[in-house]
Amino acid sequence: AKDHTLGRFVAIKVLKPEFSEDRGFVAKFRTEAQSAAGLEHPNIVNIYDVGSEEGLHYIVMEYVEGITLKTYIEKKGQLSFKEAVSIAIQVARGIEAAHNKQIIHRDIKPQNIMISTEGKVKVMDFGIARAASSNTVSSDVMGSVHYSSPEQARNGFVDGRSDIYSLGIVMYEMVTGRVPFDGDTTVAVAIQHLQEEMTPPSVYAKNLPISMEKI
């Protein structure tokens, strides 16, 4: 959309109608989004406004021209470790800025990471995951469970370490072109996060430095 006041393009996310009728969800959605609106960092998609009009609840955010990291991985198959590290560092900087303000993302995955046409990496959807995870099941759950921390898999206490774990899974996918755990159901994948040892990424990514494998 075009912001006529400031003369810039913005992205708008609108809450689905089935969620808009849940007052508790809407209240949590607004609270979380308003908290995230206080985040300003080069590696975060900034939130400009939160509001509602005629029953539609929306978030106005920075418009990033580019593609998601998920699409980028699918196009390239596997990323070199140097490129993966560069992307991971930028994601980590964004996550750190949020954690410094006591904001946890809870849904770090390649679909929530944008790569702009200039090569800048930005994490999006801060403030949305917590509201969505509490009492709803979205179509994105199957995609998210591949990156969920063990504590998320068991519905336990979540803190900043969950985001770090998820970033580790994202790094694994960048260099191998696959996620470490997969299955036909969300439960099957979640159980693997809790119980299974992941195959070392060097099995799929030749010449991977030992230092990165340890991460």
Label the model's feature ranges:
Residues 50:
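Activation-segment/catalytic-loop signature of the eukaryotic protein kinase fold
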Residues 31, 40-43, 56, 141, ...:
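Flexible N-lobe loop architecture of eukaryotic-like protein kinase catalytic domains
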Residues 91-103:
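Protein kinase catalytic-loop region centered on the HRD/HxD motif
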Residues 146-215:
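C-terminal lobe helix-coil module of Hanks-type protein kinase domains
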Residues 16-38:
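AlphaC helix of the eukaryotic protein kinase fold
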Residues 87-88:
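Activation segment signature within eukaryotic-like protein kinase domains
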Residues 54-68, 72:
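Conserved short submotifs of the Hanks-type protein kinase catalytic core
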